[in-house]
UniProtKB/Swiss-Prot annotation:
Stored NCBIfam families: PRK13662.1
Stated name of the protein: Nucleoside triphosphate/diphosphate phosphatase
Cofactors (names): Mg(2+)
Similarity section: Belongs to the Ntdp family.
Organism expressing this protein natively: Streptococcus thermophilus (strain ATCC BAA-250 / LMG 18311)
Positions with a binding annotation for Mg(2+) 1: N87, D103, D107
Length: 177
């Protein structure tokens, strides 16, 4: 499949392990694609939940997806600084319809002051039993929490202020042309 180009808009679909559609983001603007990664931006993007509820993202957010890592990263650009929401999730696939991944419940939130919080551990444990996550998936996800925390602690990739600044500036250039 042909990769989307800078300035193209794509749909992002999050699924659960059992194949159910979990959440959809419409019209994420692509900022960069490589063989292994997609960087995009959501800004007042329509989000549809599995139960049909809809909402719109409040602030611009740089989104990062990778084919080798079991997480994706959302850098939310707010008045008080950058906050991050990181989903533990399968590496993405991209087809004609959307960028797709499986959401594995665990999330890491990083506040603008640097505080980190692991979220939804109870939900993960429940879904692990209900949806029969394999021991391999459980191991991979726990290892990727460690990798993610290392990225956070070392300001790697999306956790670098300059990374967010560069991609937000590029978004503004594309939006205003």
């Amino acid at each position: 499949m042909k990769l989307p180009k800078e300035g193209d808009f794509i749909t992002i679909q999050s699924y659960k392990h059992d194949g159910r559609l979990h959440r959809t983001w419409r019209d994420t603007m692509v900022l960069k694609t490589t063989e292994n990664a997609v960087i995009g931006v959501n800004d007042h993007t329509l989000v549809t939940e599995a139960d049909g509820r809809r909402w719109v993202t409040r602030e611009p957010a740089i989104v990062y997806f990778h084919k080798k890592y079991w997480f994706n990263i959302i850098a939310m650009i707010r008045d008080n600084g950058i906050s991050y929401y990181c989903n533990l999730a399968s590496p993405y696939v991209l087809d004609q319809e959307a960028l797709k991944y499986i959401d594995y419940d665990l999330d890491v939130k990083v506040f603008a002051d640097g505080e980190k919080k692991l979220l939804d551990v109870d939900e993960y444990e429940i879904h692990k039993k209900e949806m029969h996550y394999s021991p391999d998936i459980d191991y991979i996800l726990k290892e990727h929490v460690k990798i993610l925390v290392d990225w956070i602690n070392n300001g790697k990739g999306p956790f670098s202020q300059s990374y967010v600044n560069i991609w937000y500036k590029r978004y503004l250039e594309l939006r205003n042309r």
